[in-house]
């Protein structure tokens, strides 16, 4: 197997067939819905909140609400249903999450999307949760993860998952690769390619995205959707503390397995960093959209399918993907 990551690969351009990059269509379909771009902000507390989720849904973007305020999920789903917006939430696998799924079914609430979100998704507990959701809420589109092998993808698909999330520890505030010795950090793009070859259903690439060009690379190597954390951190709308240093504003960004999220120093696989304030989320989304349109034009097509067919070169290798602990 070839081992490489985002910074090791360059895509090779094809003849441009559009008069303007603005003609290029970045639309993607996931389940029963079409979205403006194949991107989704990470379901982390410093990346997504209810107001951001509503903004994204109103404007045709996919989102996944985090699971770290469990009691707010049912009111959130009700609110999104009332507003006729897409409802997309996360669950874990503990006993209280099983009860939560039962409560959704009891109230007749069917979220459009449920993401089963744990660090090591190739597990019996995730398989059982997939089956539970599919039994109680059969119309819900189930995303399961995170995984890093073809075996895991096929097993979760066979259990009933409608999509799998690929990536074990490549994120900017994840230190799984250093703390445990396991994961896809440093070879996330190759892991995506490996998993995509086995997949029969959509894959969401999760982690390791450092530039907008990495979105196109993810599409090339098999992703239907790309989950992004650090590029969506530090915005005006983002949750988390703000601090000023030497006249420059910074916002906190921490991992879901960090002590800042857990509230205790136990089984820590995440850290906190401070991101320079980036201004409005809307502006970042516009720039991301324009850059992806440019990627399509370089691929020689009019839509995302063109990116899947381009050739590529491997230019170097860097095991830590630019990160330090």
From Swiss-Prot:
The active site is at residue 174. Keywords: NADP, Oxidoreductase. GO terms for biological process: purine nucleotide metabolic process. The keyword Oxidoreductase applies. It catalyses: IMP + NH4(+) + NADP(+) = GMP + NADPH + 2 H(+). It is an enzyme of class 1 (oxidoreductase). NADP(+) binds at residues 203-226. GO terms for cellular component: cytosol; GMP reductase complex. Its EC number is 1.7.1.7. The keyword NADP applies. Pfam families: IMPDH. One of its GO terms (molecular function) is GMP reductase activity. HAMAP family: GMP_reduct_type2. NCBIfam families: GMP_reduct_2 (TIGR01306), PRK05458.1 (NF003966). Catalyzes the irreversible NADPH-dependent deamination of GMP to IMP. It functions in the conversion of nucleobase, nucleoside and nucleotide derivatives of G to A nucleotides, and in maintaining the intracellular balance of A and G nucleotides. Belongs to the IMPDH/GMPR family. GuaC type 2 subfamily. This is GMP reductase.
């Amino acid at each position: 197997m070839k081992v490489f990551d985002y910074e090791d690969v360059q895509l090779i351009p094809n003849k441009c067939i559009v008069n303007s990059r603005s003609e290029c269509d970045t639309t993607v379909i996931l389940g029963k819905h079409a979205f403006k771009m194949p991107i989704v902000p990470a379901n982390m507390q410093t990346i997504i909140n209810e107001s951001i989720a509503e903004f994204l849904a109103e404007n045709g973007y996919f989102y996944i609400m985090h699971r770290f305020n469990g009691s707010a999920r049912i009111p959130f789903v009700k609110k999104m249903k009332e507003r006729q917006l897409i409802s997309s939430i996360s669950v874990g696998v503990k006993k209280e999450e099983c009860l939560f799924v039962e409560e959704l079914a009891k109230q007749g609430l069917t979220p459009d999307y449920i993401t089963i979100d744990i660090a090591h998704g190739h597990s019996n507990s995730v398989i059982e949760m997939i089956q539970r959701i599919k039994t109680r809420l059969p119309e819900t589109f189930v995303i399961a993860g995170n995984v890093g092998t073809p075996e895991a993808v096929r097993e979760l698909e066979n259990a009933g998952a409608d999509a799998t999330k690929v990536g074990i520890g490549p994120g900017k505030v994840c230190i799984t690769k250093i703390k445990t010795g396991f994961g896809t950090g440093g070879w996330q793009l190759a892991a995506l390619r490996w998993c995509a070859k086995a997949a029969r259903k959509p894959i969401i690439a999760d982690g390791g995205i450092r530039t907008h060009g990495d979105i196109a690379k993810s599409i090339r190597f098999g992703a239907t959707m790309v989950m992004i954390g650090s590029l969506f951190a530090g915005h005006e709308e983002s949750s988390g503390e703000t601090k000023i240093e030497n006249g420059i504003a910074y916002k906190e960004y921490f991992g879901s397995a960090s002590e800042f999220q857990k509230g205790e120093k136990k089984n820590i696989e995440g850290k906190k960093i401070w991101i320079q304030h980036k201004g409005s989320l809307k502006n970042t989304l516009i720039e991301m959209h324009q850059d992806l349109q440019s990627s399509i034009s370089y691929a020689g097509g009019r839509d995302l399918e063109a990116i899947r067919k381009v050739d590529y070169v491997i230019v170097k290798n860097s095991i830590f993907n630019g990160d330090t602990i």
